[in-house]
Structures are given as structure tokens and as C-alpha cells.
Design a protein with these regions (language model features):
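Positively charged n-region of N-terminal signal peptides that target proteins for export
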Residues: 1-9, 114-116
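Subset of outer-membrane beta-barrel
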Residues: 24-323
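Sec-dependent N-terminal signal peptides
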Residues: 9-18
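Sec/Tat signal peptide C-region and signal peptidase I cleavage site
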Residues: 19-23
């Protein structure tokens, strides 16, 4: 009995340590959702690039087996407007222990040609963000009340996201800043961060190999201004096409804190396919930090739908996959 109680106490401390800033990001957390052929997850600049109106539904569950562990559900949609612009929409719901957040983004992106013959393109993206954040105290232990928190707290945040994307043939690199406006509200909690801006950098290269196949190494970097954390994903993805332009992909992702490169947070496979107008992507991550002994890993599932195919007259918005 004492061992079980002590185990719960240790687990609670670990959760508070690892996840204390997670719920303060005021944005849907980014894990491996973007690797399911959905880079719009991490940058507004990808809105409108492609030949279809796209809708992607994602479910994400972190640290399976841990009670009240982080989870989120999100809808991502984007489509092209005329030949060189795009619009997008994100709706999400996220929970982590006693915190809840939800909201959405509305995006506009514009794409220009830097050099037609060398296939160099530049994209700009802007999103308006609306977020609600709530702290639920109904599950707090009344025998050990927190002197700073005696009732439910909630707040809303209106903010913006900006991004830039450069493409040169099969190379791409994007930079994005999320929640660029500093916070003008307070939940009156001592450890609440005053700075909300998150920075993301994403780059990769698509290598054409034999037998209608592609190999795509990529790097995704995130920096959280609230507490100075930064994490990096190292990814590799193999894509195989058939004669009908359907394809499947397999790969792997390796995530680590940048001050602990040799101690990964998580590592795991990614798989998926596109068949006609439907795509499915799945990723599994094995937790390798102090929570490893208490959970069965992290799962992410994305189901995508593509509608209203219309080829663009501008190469800067044509599909980046298998040009």
C-alpha cells in the first residue's frame, strides 16, 4: 500500500515537472502530426500549396497509461485561392491534467516566384489565433489545498502567428513565430509565464531515388520563450509511389532537448498512405525520459481527405509531393 502511494507521489511530481509549461503554451502541442503529409500544422505558410482542398483530422494521446495525461484533438483545413494564395483553418481541443484549452486559427498565405527557371519560391503566412484556457480545481485534494488556487480559473487569448517559407526545387525551410503578442492577462498564479511566443524552424530535402521512390530527411526545431526550453526532431521518411500516384510512407522520428542531445525524449516509427482522396498517418513514440517506467508511449493518428482537385497555373502553389 505504501509503495503504491509513494509511486503515485513520484509520478505526480514527474508530471508536474515535465508538463508544467506544456499547458501554458496556449496553442495545440506539436508532436509528429506534421509528418503525416500535413506541414500546415507547424506553419501558416503551407496553406494553399497543393492541388486539393485538404482536411486532416488528428487525435493525439501522450503517455498512455498515465491518468489525465496530455491529449488533443484537432481539425486542419486549407485550400488555394486563385493561383498564388491560400487560406486555412485550425480547430483544436487540448487537455493536460486539470488544465483545458481550446481554440482555433484562421490563416492567409501568399506565395510568390523568386526565380521561375531555378524553381525558387517564397511564401508568407499570417494566422489569427483565438484560445481559451481553463484551470479546473474540482479534482484538487481538499485536504491539501494550494494557497494560490482556490477556485476555477479561465482566460482567453487573442494573438497572431507569422511565418516565412523558402523553397528551392526539393529543398524547403520555414520559420514561424506563434503568439507574437505578449500576454495582457493573468490567472494570478505564481508560476504563470509572462511570455507566450514560440518559435519553430523546419527544413528538409526530398531525394529522388530509384523505382518511383523518395527519401526525405528533415529537422524540426522548437523554442519556447516562456521557460527557455528548446527541442529538436530529427526525421527520416521514405515514400513509395505506384503508377496511379498513390503512395505509402514509412520513417522514424527522434526528439531530444537541445541541452541533452544524447538523452532523447522520445523515438519511434511513422507510417501512412495516400489512396485516392484519403490518407492515413500513424506515429508511435517510445518515451525515454523519467516517465518511461510509468507509460506505454505516445500515439498520434491522422486521417486526411482531399476534395475538389484543381491544378494551379502557378508552380509556386503546385503540389510539393512528387512534382
Amino acid at each position: 500500500m505504501k509503495n503504491n502511494k509513494m509511486k503515485k507521489i513520484v509520478l505526480s511530481i514527474l508530471l508536474l515537472t515535465v508538463a508544467s509549461s506544456y499547458s501554458q503554451e496556449l496553442n495545440v502541442p506539436v508532436a509528429t502530426q506534421y509528418l503525416a503529409d500535413n506541414p500546415y500544422v507547424i506553419s501558416p505558410t503551407y496553406a494553399g500549396i497543393g492541388d486539393n482542398f485538404r482536411i486532416n483530422l488528428n487525435g493525439y494521446k501522450q503517455w498512455v497509461g498515465v491518468e489525465d495525461s496530455p491529449q488533443s484533438q484537432a481539425l486542419y483545413a486549407d485550400f488555394r485561392v486563385l493561383n498564388q494564395s491560400g487560406v486555412g483553418l485550425t480547430l483544436y481541443n487540448d487537455s493536460n491534467g486539470n488544465t483545458r484549452q481550446g481554440g482555433g486559427k484562421v490563416t492567409f498565405a501568399h506565395h510568390i516566384i523568386l526565380d521561375y527557371y531555378t524553381e525558387q519560391y517564397l511564401s508568407f503566412g499570417l494566422s489569427y489565433i483565438y484560445n481559451t484556457f481553463r484551470l479546473d480545481t474540482s479534482n484538487f485534494d481538499p485536504a491539501n489545498p494550494d494557497s494560490d488556487i482556490t477556485d476555477d480559473r479561465s482566460t482567453t487569448n487573442n494573438n497572431f502567428e507569422v511565418g516565412f517559407l523558402y523553397r528551392n526545387k526539393k529543398f524547403y525551410a520555414s520559420a514561424t513565430a506563434t503568439n507574437i503578442l505578449q500576454k495582457d492577462f493573468s490567472l494570478e498564479i505564481a508560476y504563470e509565464p509572462n511570455k507566450l511566443t514560440n518559435y519553430q524552424f523546419y527544413t528538409g530535402y526530398v531525394l529522388d531515388i530509384k523505382n518511383r521512390s523518395e527519401l526525405e530527411p528533415s529537422v524540426f526545431y522548437q523554442y519556447y520563450q516562456s521557460d527557455g526550453r528548446s527541442v529538436t526532431d530529427l526525421n527520416i521518411k521514405y515514400r513509395k509511389f505506384n503508377r496511379y500516384e498513390d503512395y505509402f510512407w514509412v520513417g522514424a522520428s527522434y526528439r531530444f532537448l537541445n541541452d541533452q542531445i544524447g538523452k532523447p525524449l522520445a523515438v519511434g516509427p511513422i507510417v501512412g498512405f495516400l489512396k485516392g482522396y484519403i490518407s492515413v498517418g500513424y506515429s508511435y513514440q517510445v518515451t525515454l525520459n523519467d516517465l518511461a517506467a510509468y507509460n506505454a508511449g505516445t500515439h498520434s493518428l491522422t486521417i486526411g481527405f482531399r476534395f475538389l482537385q484543381g491544378l494551379s497555373n502557378c508552380p509556386c502553389t503546385q503540389s510539393p509531393v512528387h512534382d
